[in-house]
Regions:
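Structural/interface elements that position substrates and couple domains in central-metabolism enzymes
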Residues: 1-171
């Protein structure tokens, strides 16, 4: 039973990354994707088995630049999570160092949005609900994509602003 749960979780992470790639015209190569959240759940800095690690890995492999904001997870933790995954997958040290040049971490969310092609919500932090999404939209390339992996934002409001908004499990 648990093996099936793990397989389904892995499939969902893969599907989320694929949804981002497909909606950004089948490539994220050279594109800036902003991640909101890295921890596996809100109110913690625990990143064990966080979906963000696997989604980032897939997008980086496709050439994306990942810009990350999480209120509790440090840059060194984020980079060590990715390095650990890549080492497990047998990726060379040189290749890992190259991949890490595609990862950017911010202390303030507002700094992560400028010139983003897409935003992916990967942790359900309360603060994300209270952002000024109108201002964020103005900072982004158009069409501005928002992928809500936690279904915490108001779809109607975001679409009204102009976002191409996608929720997990919904169209």
């Amino acid at each position: 039973y648990w093996e099936q749960v793990i397989k389904l979780n892995d499939y969902q992470k893969h599907r989320f990354a694929k949804k981002i790639i497909n909606n950004l015209f089948n490539t994220v190569n050279g594109k800036k994707i902003t991640f909101l959240g890295w921890a596996f759940k809100k109110d913690t800095n625990d990143t064990r088995e966080s979906a963000a690690i696997y989604v980032a890995d897939q997008l980086i492999e496709d050439g994306a630049n990942i810009h990350i904001y999480d209120p509790k997870v440090t840059e060194s933790k984020i980079k060590s999570d990715l390095t650990y995954l890549w080492e497990l997958n047998g990726i060379s040290e040189n290749r890992i160092l190259k991949k890490l040049t595609q990862v950017f971490v911010y202390d303030k969310a507002i700094d992560a949005f400028k010139d983003s092609h897409a935003i992916a919500v990967l942790t359900e932090w309360e603060e994300f609900k209270n952002y000024n999404w109108k201002n964020i939209y103005k900072e982004m390339y158009k069409p501005a994509f928002l992928f809500d992996g936690r279904n915490i934002l108001c779809a109607e409001e975001l679409r009204e602003i102009g976002f191409e908004y996608y929720q997990i499990g919904k169209i």
